Amino acid sequence: MSDSPLVQVRDLVKHFPVRGGVLQRTVGWVQAVDGVSFDIRRGETLGLVGESGCGKTTVGRLLLRLIEPTSGSIKFDGVELTQLNGASLRPYRRRMQIIFQDPYASLDPRTPIGDSIGEGLRIHGLGTGPERREKVRRMMDLVGLMPYHARRYPHEFSGGQRQRIGIARALVLEPDLIVCDEPVSALDVSIQAQVLNLLNQLQRELGLTYVFVAHNMGVVEHISDRVAVMYLGRIAELADRRDLFHQQEHPYTQALMSAIPIPNPELRRQRVILKGDVPSPVNPPSGCRFHPRCQLRQQLDGPAICAQAVPPLIELGGGHECACHFRQPGGATPEEIARSMSAVGTPGR
């Protein structure tokens, strides 16, 4: 894994219009992604996690330009993708691929899987017919499929086999970056492990870079090098996998981790119970978007700054970043930070 970034994202925003009335006029905006910034290093796996509706899948699709950003910057290998269109974007589409969540819905039921895997080669005009068939055969072998499978249709395969087909289709163009959009969430646990191990093996052999979108923290721990935790369109915490699972800094991450079961009946994890529902992205809370449900804010008697100011994503040390007013470099406790804010006149209660 290289320290040089393959992808650099800065202040990425995506708002979807909400339309209503007879004329279908825009009556509001869904703030799906709101000011997200991060880097993806070459050869690493960056996990994107969070509850449903947090914006993690939207981020993955924005990276691939499957949907257009409202604003912000996406640099791939030093090139600003948001400035490219049509023919100028085409060479970069070859270098970025996606593995979809539903391995059946993402395959054409009327097309033999050999043709589906080789479709990218045909679209980009790569190779002759025999060369494409040989490339498809090699990709199928790489993911554990047999040559005779090429003539079969998607309904003839199990869920795990269909996901292997999706992986082969993503690999056939020899991409640098693959966005894995919850690729194992629809599979049985035993099949999940097989697919995750396959992805790890392919990354080692081919030098791939992954963005792994998931809501299962156990899966993310197994495959990721770094993890970004999202909440309502923003990154709450970003850290090395080992650091994040050893010491969570953001209250939301702490709540997520407390829900992971421990496979030992004699050990118990202290659960953090979040009150209330996730707010609507059409009308998100002001300030820190987590503040209406935040257990730390409740412990500190409701500091006003949480509702008044957006906390920046700051580095606490060792590449561990957190967006919380009461987490700062140096190891001060939230209570100490709250007292220092009161002393200098920062809004308290």
What are the residue ranges of the model-derived segments?
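Short catalytic/signature loops enriched in Gly
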Residues: 2-5, 18-24, 29, 240-349
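ABC ATPase NBD coupling module
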Residues: 22-27, 81-97, 123, 129-130, ...
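P-loop NTP-binding/switch modules centered on Walker-like glycine-rich loops
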Residues: 51, 179, 183, 187, ...
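Conserved ABC transporter NBD signature motif
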Residues: 72-80
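Conserved ABC ATPase "signature" region
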Residues: 79-80, 131-148, 201, 254-258
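Conserved ABC ATPase signature
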Residues: 153-157, 161
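A short, proline-enriched helix->beta-strand linker immediately N-terminal to the Walker B motif
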Residues: 172-176
